[in-house]
A protein has these predicted regions:
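Short secondary-structure boundary/capping segments
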Residues: 7, 25, 122-123, 169-170
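C-terminal substrate-binding subdomain of Rossmann-fold SDR/epimerase-dehydratase oxidoreductases
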Residues: 126-243
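Conserved alpha-helical elements of sugar-nucleotide-dependent glycosyltransferases
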Residues: 41, 117, 187
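Short glycine-/acidic-enriched loop or helix-start segments at secondary-structure transitions
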Residues: 26-27, 67-69, 107, 143, ...
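Gly/Ser/Thr-rich beta-alpha loop segments that engage phosphate groups in nucleotides
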Residues: 43, 62, 68, 107, ...
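NAD(P)-dependent short-chain dehydrogenase/reductase
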Residues: 72-74, 78, 82-141, 146-157, ...
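N-terminal Rossmann-like NAD(P)+-binding domain of SDR-like oxidoreductases, especially those catalyzing
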Residues: 1-103, 153, 157, 227, ...
Length: 243
């Protein structure tokens, strides 16, 4: 309920709605929890923000580009985006969607069902275990460093607050969907190669709901926000794990 947000001591300038049950595979086993958190939870955030017309910046998912009905996670993240659009159109609530592309970086999860492929490889490499690769490893992903993601979110918030403080329209940011991807992708085999061409790997069956490719081709974040990703996945792996 909206009372869940009473912990705020004062009205925030912007709400970053980043909370979600992430990852595709766990959503098959926990569909109710996934819908409650990702869809119902998002509507509650929006309803609370609507009371004071507080801008909401939402963490969307690049998986929304694929088949929205192939797994509960993708469907609920897409529903979250649609809720953002609904509240913006019907109640004129300032909402912005930032789609994330396979986020990685320091202190990422390396254990449990919510860790990413980079986190899994990190754990396996440090433990001297073979890297487990699903399918044939030729599925491709656009990977974005957490620092670049944060930079994109901050640029959104700064644009909104600056425009509001100066009595200007926020329409160039609110109501928009920004893709926070690098515009370059790597196959999972190429990611594994970064840990060493000769490092052992093990191929396992394809998982349900797995997409063949993600790649950011939209330039709106660059054109409107001046956002430009600075980090590269392969360089990150070699710097922090291999060298």
């Amino acid at each position: 309920t909206c009372d869940d947000f009473d912990f705020f001591m004062e009205k925030p300038d912007v709400v970053f709605h980043l909370a979600a049950l992430a990852r595709i595979q766990p959503s098959f086993d926990e569909p109710t929890e996934t819908f409650d958190t990702n869809t119902v939870g998002t509507q509650r955030v929006l309803e609370w923000a609507r009371k004071d017309n507080t801008p909401v910046i939402y963490a969307g998912s690049s998986s929304s580009h694929g088949d929205k009905y192939c797994n509960p996670y993708t469907f609920t993240k897409w529903q979250g985006e649609e809720l953002m659009k609904l509240y913006n159109k019907v109640w004129d609530l300032p909402t912005t969607i930032c789609r994330f592309y396979n986020v990685y970086g320091p202190q990422q999860l390396t254990e449990g069902k919510y860790c990413t492929v980079v986190g899994i490889f990190e754990r396996q490499y440090k433990n001297g275990e073979p890297l487990t690769i699903t399918w044939e490893g030729e599925q491709r992903r656009d990977f974005t460093h957490i620092d670049d993601i944060v930079d994109g979110l901050v640029k959104c918030a700064e644009g909104i607050t600056f425009s509001r403080e100066n009595g200007e329209s926020t329409g160039h940011i609110t109501g928009q969907l920004f893709e926070l991807g690098t515009g370059h992708n790597y196959s999972i085999n190429e990611v594994a190669d970064a840990f060493g061409d000769d490092y052992p790997r093990e191929y396992i069956d394809r998982r349900p709901g797995e997409m063949l490719e993600t790649l950011c081709v939209d330039t709106l974040a660059k054109d409107v926000l001046g956002w430009k990703p600075k980090k590269d996945l392969i360089e990150f792996i070699k710097k922090y794990y291999v060298e």
